[in-house]
A protein has these predicted regions:
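N-terminal start-of-chain detector that recognizes signal peptides
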Residues: 90-96, 120-121, 150-155
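Short, compositionally biased leader-like segments
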Residues: 71-96
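Short beta-strand scaffold segments in enzyme catalytic cores
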Residues: 117-125, 180-184
Protein backbone atom coordinates (compact mmCIF):
# COMPACT_ATOMS: atom_id res chain seq x y z
CA UNK A 1 0.00 0.00 0.00
CA UNK A 2 2.97 2.33 -0.57
CA UNK A 3 1.80 5.84 -1.47
CA UNK A 4 -1.79 4.57 -1.52
CA UNK A 5 -4.59 5.86 0.65
CA UNK A 6 -5.68 3.49 3.40
CA UNK A 7 -7.79 3.99 6.49
CA UNK A 8 -9.03 1.90 9.41
CA UNK A 9 -12.82 2.17 9.51
CA UNK A 10 -14.23 1.10 12.85
CA UNK A 11 -17.56 2.57 13.89
CA UNK A 12 -21.12 1.63 14.82
CA UNK A 13 -21.90 0.85 11.17
CA UNK A 14 -19.09 -1.63 10.58
CA UNK A 15 -19.91 -3.17 13.97
CA UNK A 16 -23.59 -3.38 12.99
CA UNK A 17 -22.89 -5.16 9.72
CA UNK A 18 -20.48 -7.58 11.40
CA UNK A 19 -23.05 -8.33 14.12
CA UNK A 20 -25.72 -9.17 11.54
CA UNK A 21 -23.28 -11.41 9.67
CA UNK A 22 -22.37 -13.28 12.85
CA UNK A 23 -26.04 -13.65 13.78
CA UNK A 24 -26.81 -15.16 10.37
CA UNK A 25 -23.97 -17.68 10.62
CA UNK A 26 -24.99 -18.50 14.20
CA UNK A 27 -28.61 -19.13 13.18
CA UNK A 28 -27.55 -21.22 10.18
CA UNK A 29 -25.45 -23.46 12.43
CA UNK A 30 -28.19 -23.79 15.06
CA UNK A 31 -30.78 -24.58 12.39
CA UNK A 32 -28.58 -27.30 10.92
CA UNK A 33 -27.37 -28.74 14.22
CA UNK A 34 -30.80 -28.97 15.88
CA UNK A 35 -32.49 -29.80 12.56
CA UNK A 36 -35.23 -27.18 12.91
CA UNK A 37 -37.82 -26.41 10.26
CA UNK A 38 -37.29 -22.67 10.67
CA UNK A 39 -35.92 -20.08 13.05
CA UNK A 40 -37.04 -16.53 13.85
CA UNK A 41 -35.47 -13.59 15.66
CA UNK A 42 -37.01 -10.53 17.29
CA UNK A 43 -36.34 -7.50 15.08
CA UNK A 44 -36.58 -4.99 17.96
CA UNK A 45 -34.05 -6.88 20.08
CA UNK A 46 -31.82 -7.25 17.03
CA UNK A 47 -31.53 -3.47 16.80
CA UNK A 48 -30.16 -3.56 20.36
CA UNK A 49 -27.56 -6.18 19.34
CA UNK A 50 -29.34 -9.00 21.16
CA UNK A 51 -30.62 -12.24 19.64
CA UNK A 52 -34.08 -13.25 20.86
CA UNK A 53 -34.95 -16.36 18.89
CA UNK A 54 -37.78 -18.80 18.39
CA UNK A 55 -36.97 -22.12 16.75
CA UNK A 56 -39.72 -24.09 15.01
CA UNK A 57 -40.10 -27.88 15.18
CA UNK A 58 -36.55 -28.92 16.05
CA UNK A 59 -35.56 -32.58 15.97
CA UNK A 60 -32.88 -32.07 18.63
CA UNK A 61 -32.51 -29.81 21.68
CA UNK A 62 -32.07 -26.28 20.33
CA UNK A 63 -30.65 -25.06 23.65
CA UNK A 64 -27.72 -27.43 23.34
CA UNK A 65 -27.02 -26.01 19.89
CA UNK A 66 -27.26 -22.46 21.24
CA UNK A 67 -24.73 -23.28 23.96
CA UNK A 68 -22.35 -24.73 21.41
CA UNK A 69 -22.42 -21.81 18.97
CA UNK A 70 -23.19 -18.58 20.83
CA UNK A 71 -19.65 -18.13 22.18
CA UNK A 72 -18.13 -18.94 18.81
CA UNK A 73 -20.05 -16.09 17.16
CA UNK A 74 -19.97 -13.73 20.16
CA UNK A 75 -23.72 -13.15 20.35
CA UNK A 76 -26.05 -12.79 23.34
CA UNK A 77 -28.98 -15.17 22.92
CA UNK A 78 -32.35 -15.45 24.66
CA UNK A 79 -35.47 -17.46 23.93
CA UNK A 80 -38.56 -15.45 23.09
CA UNK A 81 -40.93 -14.38 20.34
CA UNK A 82 -39.48 -13.78 16.90
CA UNK A 83 -40.99 -11.93 13.96
CA UNK A 84 -38.11 -11.98 11.47
CA UNK A 85 -37.27 -15.31 9.79
CA UNK A 86 -33.69 -16.21 8.97
CA UNK A 87 -34.42 -16.10 5.24
CA UNK A 88 -35.16 -12.35 5.50
CA UNK A 89 -32.02 -11.48 7.45
CA UNK A 90 -29.83 -11.60 4.34
CA UNK A 91 -31.83 -8.77 2.79
CA UNK A 92 -31.66 -6.99 6.15
CA UNK A 93 -27.86 -6.79 5.85
CA UNK A 94 -28.09 -5.14 2.43
CA UNK A 95 -30.72 -2.69 3.69
CA UNK A 96 -28.55 -1.82 6.69
CA UNK A 97 -25.56 -1.16 4.44
CA UNK A 98 -27.73 1.02 2.20
CA UNK A 99 -28.74 3.16 5.20
CA UNK A 100 -25.20 3.49 6.55
CA UNK A 101 -21.92 2.91 4.68
CA UNK A 102 -23.50 3.22 1.23
CA UNK A 103 -23.43 7.02 1.34
CA UNK A 104 -19.75 7.07 2.24
CA UNK A 105 -18.84 4.74 -0.61
CA UNK A 106 -20.79 6.93 -3.03
CA UNK A 107 -18.32 9.72 -2.28
CA UNK A 108 -15.47 7.45 -3.31
CA UNK A 109 -17.43 6.34 -6.38
CA UNK A 110 -17.26 9.94 -7.59
CA UNK A 111 -13.48 9.88 -7.18
CA UNK A 112 -13.33 6.67 -9.18
CA UNK A 113 -15.59 8.16 -11.85
CA UNK A 114 -13.10 11.01 -12.30
CA UNK A 115 -9.76 9.21 -11.92
CA UNK A 116 -10.55 5.56 -12.66
CA UNK A 117 -8.83 4.52 -9.42
CA UNK A 118 -10.98 2.07 -7.45
CA UNK A 119 -11.48 1.95 -3.67
CA UNK A 120 -12.25 -1.11 -1.56
CA UNK A 121 -14.09 -1.32 1.76
CA UNK A 122 -13.85 -4.49 3.83
CA UNK A 123 -15.75 -5.30 7.02
CA UNK A 124 -14.27 -7.99 9.27
CA UNK A 125 -16.28 -10.38 11.41
CA UNK A 126 -15.03 -8.61 14.57
CA UNK A 127 -16.66 -5.33 13.55
CA UNK A 128 -13.54 -3.55 12.36
CA UNK A 129 -13.18 -2.38 8.79
CA UNK A 130 -10.72 -0.85 6.37
CA UNK A 131 -10.79 1.34 3.27
CA UNK A 132 -7.96 1.11 0.75
CA UNK A 133 -7.08 2.71 -2.56
CA UNK A 134 -6.41 0.37 -5.45
CA UNK A 135 -5.32 0.86 -9.06
CA UNK A 136 -7.02 2.16 -12.17
CA UNK A 137 -9.83 -0.22 -13.12
CA UNK A 138 -8.60 -2.78 -10.62
CA UNK A 139 -10.02 -3.85 -7.27
CA UNK A 140 -7.75 -4.88 -4.42
CA UNK A 141 -8.50 -8.29 -2.86
CA UNK A 142 -7.14 -8.48 0.70
CA UNK A 143 -6.65 -12.01 2.02
CA UNK A 144 -8.20 -11.36 5.45
CA UNK A 145 -11.61 -13.08 5.87
CA UNK A 146 -14.40 -10.52 5.63
CA UNK A 147 -18.11 -10.70 6.29
CA UNK A 148 -19.03 -7.91 3.85
CA UNK A 149 -17.28 -5.72 1.31
CA UNK A 150 -17.80 -3.07 -1.34
CA UNK A 151 -15.72 -1.43 -4.03
CA UNK A 152 -16.13 1.47 -6.41
CA UNK A 153 -16.56 1.10 -10.17
CA UNK A 154 -15.79 3.66 -12.90
CA UNK A 155 -18.70 2.80 -15.19
CA UNK A 156 -22.45 3.15 -14.74
CA UNK A 157 -24.33 0.87 -14.41
CA UNK A 158 -21.69 -1.35 -12.78
CA UNK A 159 -21.11 -4.58 -14.70
CA UNK A 160 -19.09 -7.15 -12.71
CA UNK A 161 -15.67 -7.94 -14.15
CA UNK A 162 -13.70 -11.14 -13.67
CA UNK A 163 -11.95 -9.53 -10.71
CA UNK A 164 -15.32 -8.55 -9.25
CA UNK A 165 -16.55 -12.14 -9.47
CA UNK A 166 -13.40 -13.19 -7.65
CA UNK A 167 -14.09 -10.63 -4.91
CA UNK A 168 -17.65 -11.90 -4.46
CA UNK A 169 -16.48 -15.51 -4.34
CA UNK A 170 -13.87 -14.69 -1.71
CA UNK A 171 -16.52 -13.22 0.57
CA UNK A 172 -18.93 -16.13 0.10
CA UNK A 173 -16.29 -18.83 0.60
CA UNK A 174 -15.44 -17.22 3.96
CA UNK A 175 -19.16 -17.37 4.89
CA UNK A 176 -19.57 -13.66 4.42
CA UNK A 177 -22.89 -12.28 3.22
CA UNK A 178 -22.18 -10.19 0.16
CA UNK A 179 -20.42 -7.52 -1.86
CA UNK A 180 -21.58 -4.22 -3.35
CA UNK A 181 -20.22 -2.67 -6.53
CA UNK A 182 -20.60 1.10 -6.18
CA UNK A 183 -20.94 3.42 -9.18
CA UNK A 184 -22.03 7.05 -9.23
CA UNK A 185 -25.69 6.58 -10.13
CA UNK A 186 -26.38 2.97 -9.24
CA UNK A 187 -24.92 0.21 -7.11
CA UNK A 188 -25.15 -3.56 -7.50
CA UNK A 189 -25.44 -5.74 -4.39
CA UNK A 190 -24.52 -9.42 -4.83
CA UNK A 191 -25.23 -11.60 -1.81
CA UNK A 192 -26.26 -15.04 -0.63
CA UNK A 193 -29.75 -15.74 0.65
CA UNK A 194 -29.17 -19.10 2.32
CA UNK A 195 -26.24 -21.29 3.41
CA UNK A 196 -24.18 -22.42 0.46
CA UNK A 197 -23.76 -26.14 -0.08
CA UNK A 198 -20.49 -27.86 -0.94
CA UNK A 199 -21.73 -28.11 -4.51
CA UNK A 200 -22.39 -24.35 -4.53
CA UNK A 201 -18.83 -23.65 -3.38
CA UNK A 202 -17.39 -25.95 -6.04
CA UNK A 203 -19.49 -24.19 -8.69
CA UNK A 204 -18.30 -20.76 -7.52
CA UNK A 205 -14.65 -21.78 -7.68
CA UNK A 206 -15.01 -23.25 -11.15
CA UNK A 207 -16.75 -20.12 -12.44
CA UNK A 208 -14.18 -17.80 -10.91
CA UNK A 209 -11.78 -18.58 -13.75
CA UNK A 210 -14.42 -17.69 -16.32
CA UNK A 211 -15.40 -14.50 -14.55
CA UNK A 212 -19.01 -14.90 -15.67
CA UNK A 213 -21.35 -13.10 -13.29
CA UNK A 214 -24.50 -14.20 -15.13
CA UNK A 215 -23.43 -17.84 -15.12
CA UNK A 216 -22.45 -17.59 -11.45
CA UNK A 217 -25.98 -16.54 -10.53
CA UNK A 218 -27.66 -19.04 -12.84
CA UNK A 219 -25.63 -22.12 -11.95
CA UNK A 220 -25.51 -21.73 -8.18
CA UNK A 221 -28.50 -23.89 -7.29
CA UNK A 222 -30.46 -22.45 -10.22
CA UNK A 223 -30.14 -18.94 -8.83
CA UNK A 224 -31.60 -19.79 -5.42
CA UNK A 225 -28.41 -19.35 -3.40
CA UNK A 226 -27.19 -15.98 -4.70
CA UNK A 227 -29.18 -12.86 -5.46
CA UNK A 228 -28.33 -9.55 -7.09
CA UNK A 229 -30.22 -6.28 -6.92
CA UNK A 230 -29.56 -2.63 -7.62
CA UNK A 231 -29.65 -0.17 -4.75
CA UNK A 232 -29.78 3.61 -5.07
Amino acid sequence: LKNKYHEVVSDEYTAGIAFLCRVINFLEDVLEDAECDDIYVNSVALNARTVVLHAVRCKYDVFESIEVFQDRYRVNVKEGIGDLPLRELYEHVIDYYKKTLHRRMKQYAWKTHISGVEYYLGVLFNGKGFLIEGEKNKVILPGTPQCFSAHTHPLDPPVPSKNDVKAVNRILVDRGIGHVIEAVRSSLAIYRVRPLSLRDYETLKSLEKKGSFVEMIARTADGAAIRARYIH
